[in-house]
Structures are given as structure tokens and as C-alpha cells.
Amino acid sequence: MRPGPPGGPAQRQRAGRYGNHPTYGGYDQATARVGGLWDALLGEGRRWWITAISDSHVHWTRGGSDFRPGEYSKTYVLARQEYHDIMDGLRHGRIFVTTGDLITRLDVTASGQGRAAGAGETITVSRRDRTDVDVEIRFRPPAGTNANGDRPQVRRVDLIVGRVTGPSADRDADTNPTTAVVARFGPRDWRQQGAQYVIRHTLRDVGADSYLRVRGTSTDEAEPLADGLESPWSDLWFYSNPVFVRVR
């Protein structure tokens, strides 16, 4: 497990302070770069989950540069409100992360041949049948305002897919060239069901072991940009953890 947003800094001077390795949209490069380190680990078949860090040393209102825990970045775990189930959800990737309360619920489900799997899980499909995989994305915006007094809106959701090819011979490899954004969705592509929004997409003829993951943003950026001095509240993103597809 590794962090996504590194601490949720209240001042973007700190968010972008990492020299040659700035954060992108509030997240470290390992998470934010499509085909980067996180995707390289997933491509090796590793169950490597991301979480958000929300530690706080000195709050920005007291001269520091931090938010309070959970004020800006949050980790959500799909679990019952029981200690052991929360820890089980963390261990097994039933997690999504968000900044600025862009969303308060995210469910990603892959289904095919009568089987289904969610974040952190694996769906197995047979080559003997048609290997289309149906993806359903459900997200819920906040009912009220976030800690900045805003009502953020999701402007785009991306579906990202990569191949699982097994351990790399190059132990320094930090890329997965098979990973790509395969579909982008805007407000015209989702429909409302109660308090949630639903997106459906079909991956045709998935012929090899793969994984899929989802991200979304409040911006119109095609990819997260390196953080500068802008307000972190104007550059919000969420990420799911992956669903794996095994082809047999």
C-alpha cells in the first residue's frame, strides 16, 4: 500500500516543493502518471493499493501549511463499522481516495459471464466464451459543502486499463506501457439514480489478464498538471483502486 495524496497540504508551495518530483493534482507522481510506477506494480500482478495521507503538524490557520486530518484528503473503505472489517477492507483494496470531498461514494464493478468483482477483487472469464467485460461506475457527490465552503462538481471520469504481464525482468522498471485511458466520460455520459450517478461501459474482447481503475476530476485537464501556487481546492481528483480481470 502506498500513499496517493501526500499529506493534503494547505499551501501548494508545499505540494509542489519536491524539487524534480512535484505532485500532480495533489497526488504523487507514482499515482498520478498513467503508465507510471503504480501501473508498473499492478502490471506485475501486485495487489498494491493507494490510500490518502491526512497527517497534520501545524494547521494553516496557525501559521503552518497543513489541513486537519480528513479536512482535504480522505480515504474511504468499503466496510462495516467494525475494526476488523475496516482493516480487512484496507488489506484487500476496497478503497477509494478523494480530495476536497469531490465525491463521498465510489463503486466500480466489472462483470462478465455471470461473474462480478469490485475494487480489490478479481473476475475470471473464460476464453471459450465471449470475453466482453461490462464496467459500471457509480459515484455520489457530497450532500453539502466541503471544508472550503464549496460544492465541487465532477467534470470528467476516466476509465484506465492496463495489462497484467507478470514480474518484470528489469527490477528498476517503473512504467507499464500497456496502460492507457480507454474512455473518458462527461456529464452527458452519466445518468442520475437517486443521489448517485451511473456510468456504464463495455470492454470488448478482453483477451489477456488485465486490470481496470477509475479516476475523476473537477478540472478540464486531460491529465493532472504539476502543482504550482494555485488553490488546492480548485484542483480536485479521486481515484479508485483496481479491479483485476483474469482470462483463462
Pin down the residues of each PLM region.
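C-terminal functional module detector
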Residues: 3-14, 22-29, 34-248
